Curated annotation (Swiss-Prot):
Residues 589-621, 676-710 form a coiled coil. Membrane-anchored myosin receptors that define a distinct, plant-specific transport vesicle compartment. Keywords: Coiled coil, Membrane, Transmembrane, Transmembrane helix. PANTHER family: MYOSIN-BINDING PROTEIN 2. GO terms for cellular component: membrane; transport vesicle. It comes from Arabidopsis thaliana. Residues 164-184, 608-640 are annotated as: Disordered. It is found in: Endomembrane system. Residues 411-509 form the GTD-binding domain. It comes from the Eukaryota. This is Myosin-binding protein 2. The chain crosses the membrane at residues 17-37. The GTD-binding domain is sufficient for myosin binding. The keyword Protein transport does not apply.
């Protein structure tokens, strides 16, 4: 995977579990977007086919060239997998014009032409070791029924002392392949292939051309010699696709630098820390690497490096060293072979082979090469590839045998397997830790949910209780409101009653004033009468006793009036409201009135008896009218007693007074004065008795009404309701009486 800022940032700031989860999510997102892209591409093609339109080019429809900030032509070779890249490389020239667009037609055409270029196009690179030969094989690689030449392999010899390559040259010369075997028949094909060798690790001079074209592959080579270092093979070749699969000893703590050129350079950089010591003798390696051996197979295995030009514009491949599986890109079809000769020492010193970065740059075609010469060169190139592949296979077997025989060395595959097992164990440990954390988080989540549920239940209970209290408060508030309303109504009623009672009290006060005025007038009249009687009795001696009696009676009448006035003032006003309390008062007043009535009746009877005796004496002294007068007097006395008992004394006395005035007008003054005084006393007594009887009747009626009220109160709510109705009617009647009294008072005023 390409290293960028996001990957570096997330590697540094996150742990491994989070990193795995993040990349899993990103990969699934990428799969989803790829699926959408595939669906849209399929619909676009179906749409074009259905309406007979020309199918669009998949590469021309891309927007990379519009959004590329570098301004260079975009590379589409990284968008092709190995299978489709091989299919594009294997297409002939005549099929290159089929439905890929102008740019991609040129790309396929260039790939087909480069396939046919002989390996003799690349001249050998001169160095301190001499010219590097490029043997050409006869066989190519067959993949999916298609034949293509082998890939490029470069071997390096490593010794203790490092030897700079081309120390005298800062820029290597451009070598062209001699054209002794073929001639150019067609000048339309023009290609130039330049090979540059540079070393980044040992400060070797870079081999470069001044021409800057589209594609470039840099393969820096470092050659180091060692006297006693063992030989080491840093890679092996896959049998099917001949990709470079780097293998080296790796420390987990070391980070391997991954270099990716913007122009699509294919760069492999390996830093070797440990030397792989082979147990085999140096003769086996020297037989493989020495160009002077007699056997052709050993001569073929002396190839140190082979390179192949890529058809596409640029090839980007970044190889990650370690337990990750390396990414491989298909290398081009034009090989370039570089032979580094092996120098054997007499002491058969072991040598170490190290694979370093080799940069190969391809230029735009500038040579006119004959097509027939290219076809002939292709056959020799395929045979060289076949022999190279066989030699590398034998070398791999020898190196593996040497590793087995070496007690200190460890096989690369075994070490990789061991590291893979360690990584798996670590991964299992991480998974177990993740499972433990997941279980802990699940337990914590369950506890949290239980706590949340408990809090929700408590909250619901508190809400229900709050609602219940709220309802109770609302009901209590309603009850209080009703009670306040009732109290307000009662207050209004009480105020009305107080106002009515005040009005009634005012009426009673007026009545009292009237009664007092009447009483005063009566007192004045009685005094006038008494004064007249006293003056008359003072003239005669016979009138002394009667005068004393009259004074006594007068004083007694005044005291009785005062007592009655005080009694009227002590009469309760709110009799109806305080029923039970007033019953006793009524009974006491009734008894007092009855006692006074008895006293007055006794006095009346005494007076009547005295009058009867005097009249009898007068009748005996008269001249013969005793019988008639006696008969009349008996009738009168009997009538008087009946009137007293029936409370009709005043009209009777008036009638008697009228008769006596008419009948005895010629009598003496003594008799007339005596009769007038007696009549005045009788009138006052009769008035008092009438008033007492009226009051007694009122008290009796009130007493009966109060008894009925108390009985109705004892019966319950119905009686109380009935009593309220009766009282309301009484109030209405009283209001009517009060209004009449007021109207009468206003009229009188």
């Amino acid at each position: 995977m390409a290293a960028n800022k996001f990957a570096t940032l997330i590697h540094r700031k996150t742990n491994r579990i989070t990193l795995i989860l993040v990349y899993a999510f990103l990969e699934w997102s990428l799969i989803f977007f790829i699926l959408l892209n595939s669906l849209f591409s399929y619909f676009i093609l179906r749409f074009a086919d259905y309406f007979g339109l020309k199918r669009p080019c998949l590469f021309c429809s891309r927007l990379d060239r519009f959004f590329d900030a570098s301004g260079k032509s975009p590379s589409h070779r990284d968008l092709l997998c190995d299978d489709h890249a091989l299919q594009l490389h294997s297409k002939p020239v005549e099929e290159s014009n089929c439905g890929f667009g102008e740019f991609h037609n040129d790309l396929v055409h260039r790939g087909c032409c480069v396939e046919k270029i002989s390996s003799s196009l690349c001249a050998p690179i001169e160095s301190d070791f001499g010219n590097l030969d490029y043997p050409i094989g006869d066989e190519g690689q067959i993949y999916n029924g298609l034949k293509f030449p082998r890939s490029i392999f470069v071997f390096e010899e490593e010794k203790v002392g490092s030897v700079n390559l081309n120390d005298s040259q800062e820029e290597t010369e451009e070598k062209k392949v001699p054209q002794s075997h073929e001639k150019l028949e067609d000048d339309d094909v023009d290609e130039e292939f330049s090979c540059y060798v540079s070393s980044f690790d040992c400060k070797n001079k870079e081999i470069a051309t001044e021409k800057e074209e589209e594609n470039r592959v840099d393969l820096p080579i470092e050659v180091e010699t060692a006297e006693s270092a063992p030989k080491n093979l840093e890679f092996y070749i896959d049998e099917e696709d001949c990709h470079l699969i780097p293998v080296e000893f790796y420390k987990p703590s070391e980070e391997v630098r991954e270099i990716s050129d913007i122009n699509g350079d294919f760069i492999l950089d390996f830093g070797v820390e440990h030397d792989f010591t082979a147990a085999a003798e140096t003769e086996e390696i020297s037989d493989f690497a020495s160009p002077g051996e007699s056997k052709p197979e050993d001569a073929e295995t002396n190839l140190v490096a082979s390179e192949m030009e890529n058809d596409d514009e640029e090839t980007d491949a970044e190889v990650s060293i370690g337990t990750e599986i390396p990414d491989h890109e298909q290398i081009g079809d034009i090989p370039s072979h570089q032979l580094i000769p092996h120098h054997d020492d007499d002491d058969h010193e072991e040598e170490t082979l190290e694979f370093k970065t080799v940069t190969i740059e391809t230029k735009m075609p500038v040579l006119n090469i004959n097509e027939e010469r290219i076809l002939e060169a292709q056959g020799s190139m395929e045979s060289s590839h076949s022999s190279l592949h066989n030699a590398m296979f034998h070398l791999e077997q020898r190196v593996s045998v040497d590793g087995i025989e070496c007690p200190e060395g460890v096989l690369t595959v075994d070490k990789l397997k061991f590291e893979l097992q360690e990584e798996r164990k670590a991964l299992h440990a991480l998974y177990e830790e993740l499972e433990v954390e997941r279980n802990a988080s699940a337990v914590a989540a369950s506890e949290t949910m239980a706590m949340i549920n408990r809090l929700h239940e408590e909250k619901a209970a508190m809400q229900m209780e709050a609602l219940q209290y709220q309802r109770m408060m609302e009901e209590q508030a309603e009850f209080d409101q009703e009670a306040l309303q009732l109290l307000n109504e009662l207050m209004v009623n009480r105020e009305k009653e107080n106002a009515e009672l005040e009005k009634e009290l005012e009426v009673y006060r007026k009545r009292m004033e009237e009664y007092e005025a009447k009483e005063k007038m009566g007192m004045l009249r009685r005094r006038l009468r008494d004064s007249s009687v006293d003056s008359y009795r003072n003239n005669g001696d016979s009138d002394e006793n009667s005068n004393g009696e009259l004074q006594f009676k007068n004083v007694e009448g005044v005291t009785d009036w005062k007592y009655r006035e005080n009694e009227m003032e002590n009469t309760p006003v709110d009799v109806v409201l305080r029923l039970d309390e007033c019953l006793d008062d009524y009974d006491g007043e009734r008894l007092s009135i009855l006692g006074r009535l008895k006293f007055l009746e006794e006095k009346l009877t005494d007076l009547n008896n005295e009058e009867d005796d005097e009249e009898e004496a007068k009748t005996f002294e008269s001249n013969g009218s005793i019988n008639g007068n006696e008969h009349i007097h008996g009738k009168e006395t009997n009538g008087k007693h009946r009137v007293i008992k029936s409370k009709r004394l005043l009209p009777l006395f008036d009638a008697v007074d009228g008769e006596m005035e008419n009948g005895l007008s010629n009598g003496n003054h003594h008799e007339n004065g005596f009769d007038d005084s007696e009549k005045g006393e009788n009138v006052t007594i009769e008035e008092e008795v009438d008033e007492l009887y009226e009051r007694l009747e009122a008290l009796e009626a009130d007493r009966e009404f109060l008894r009925h009220c108390v009985g109705s109160l004892k019966k319950g709510d119905k009686g109380v309701h009935l009593l309220h109705e009766i009282l309301q009617h009484l109030r209405d009647l009283r209001n009517i009486d009060l209004t009449r009294v007021r109207e009468n008072g206003d009229m009188s005023l």
